[in-house]
From Swiss-Prot:
<feature type="active site" description="Charge relay system">
    <location>
        <position position="223"/>
    </location>
</feature>
<feature type="active site" description="Charge relay system">
    <location>
        <position position="256"/>
    </location>
</feature>
<dbReference type="GO" id="GO:0018738">
    <property type="term" value="F:S-formylglutathione hydrolase activity"/>
</dbReference>
<dbReference type="GO" id="GO:0052689">
    <property type="term" value="F:carboxylic ester hydrolase activity"/>
</dbReference>
<keyword id="KW-0378">Hydrolase</keyword>
<keyword id="KW-0719">Serine esterase</keyword>
<dbReference type="GO" id="GO:0005829">
    <property type="term" value="C:cytosol"/>
</dbReference>
<comment type="function">
    <text>Serine hydrolase involved in the detoxification of formaldehyde. Hydrolyzes S-formylglutathione to glutathione and formate.</text>
</comment>
<feature type="active site" description="Charge relay system">
    <location>
        <position position="145"/>
    </location>
</feature>
<dbReference type="Pfam" id="PF00756">
    <property type="entry name" value="Esterase"/>
</dbReference>
<protein>
    <recommendedName>
        <fullName>S-formylglutathione hydrolase YeiG</fullName>
        <ecNumber>3.1.2.12</ecNumber>
    </recommendedName>
</protein>
<comment type="similarity">
    <text>Belongs to the esterase D family.</text>
</comment>
<dbReference type="GO" id="GO:0046294">
    <property type="term" value="P:formaldehyde catabolic process"/>
</dbReference>
<dbReference type="InterPro" id="IPR000801">
    <property type="entry name" value="Esterase-like"/>
</dbReference>
<dbReference type="InterPro" id="IPR029058">
    <property type="entry name" value="AB_hydrolase_fold"/>
</dbReference>
<dbReference type="InterPro" id="IPR014186">
    <property type="entry name" value="S-formylglutathione_hydrol"/>
</dbReference>
């Protein structure tokens, strides 16, 4: 591992690291915020997954999460949104290829060689964080848009791994919206049954009651992608039918930007703290 930068921030440290990923077959960067140490108890971790076109720095520089994370004593880990590099398959569109990994394991060539973000987030990155930093094994997960989709599927596919999950403007039903259909048909092929294991709504309908965890979703009603790409009401209906403990908040006037995330990130951190710090 190589440290790329480090900044003092709210008595803690904001760092950026590069490491060689055996899962993704390329070098990867991640950002991490380490809160000021409280006592000898290792702090819990909140993983943040960003959206289309982003990397590990968007949340770090725009969301303003460090102040509250420092106060609460929560480590923030921000991975990149896809594998990177000249040898990694790419696409000219903003919504496919590098910067648009969709947090799944691709099965189709040429994508399958590198696009295994799900395995990276489930196994390799948490093991790296555990081995290199003083953290507890308690963790939660959150994300925005494509990253909201990522956070939800990570939680739904891994019962017991996360204490709680939250999302801002998530893509909840990728099997049925243009962003998801484009990505899934490219990464996973045309068999739509294979898509279902990466769709939050399908996963929630298939979930067991004992695996439900507290879930918070914020969605702006002035989001230009709300009707065509996001459709949170579809997941809310799945949660209602499954009695899943989900709160969906529609925030009047807010759009899809980091101004929206910055406005409510404190709520999300305090929401996760209730369960992380138990």
């Amino acid at each position: 591992m190589e440290m790329l930068e480090e900044h003092r921030c709210f008595e803690g440290w904001q760092q950026r690291w590069r490491h060689d990923s055996s899962t993704l077959n390329c070098p990867m960067t991640f950002s991490i915020f380490l809160p000021p140490p409280r006592d000898h108890t290792p702090p819990p971790v909140l993983y943040w997954l960003s959206g289309l076109t982003c990397n590990d720095e968007n949340f770090t520089t725009k969301a303003g999460a460090q102040r509250v994370a420092a106060e609460l004593g929560i480590v923030l880990v921000m991975p990149d949104t896809s594998p990177r590099g000249e040898q990694v398959a790419n696409d000219d569109g903003y919504d496919l290829g590098q910067g648009a990994g969709f947090y799944l394991n691709a099965t189709q060539p040429p994508w399958a060689t590198h696009y295994r973000m799900y395995d990276y987030l489930r196994d390799e990155l948490p093991a790296l964080i555990q081995s290199q930093f003083n953290v507890s094994d308690r963790c939660a997960i959150s994300g925005h848009s494509m990253g909201g989709h990522g956070a939800l599927i990570m939680a739904l596919k891994n019962p017991g791994k996360y204490t709680s999950v939250s999302a801002f403007a998530p893509i909840v039903n990728p099997c049925s919206v243009p962003w998801g259909i484009k990505a899934f048909s490219t990464y996973l092929g045309e068999d739509k049954n294979a898509w279902l294991e990466w769709d939050s709504c399908a996963l929630m309908y298939a979930s067991n009651a004992q695996d439900a965890i507290p879930t918070l979703i914020d969605q702006g009603d002035n989001d230009q992608f709300l009707a065509d790409q996001l459709q949170p009401a579809v997941l809310a209906e799945a949660a209602r039918q499954k009695a899943w403990p989900m709160t969906l908040r529609i925030q009047p006037g807010y759009d899809h930007s980091y101004y929206f995330i910055a406005s409510f990130i404190e709520d999300h951190l305090r929401f996760h703290a209730q369960y992380l710090l138990k």
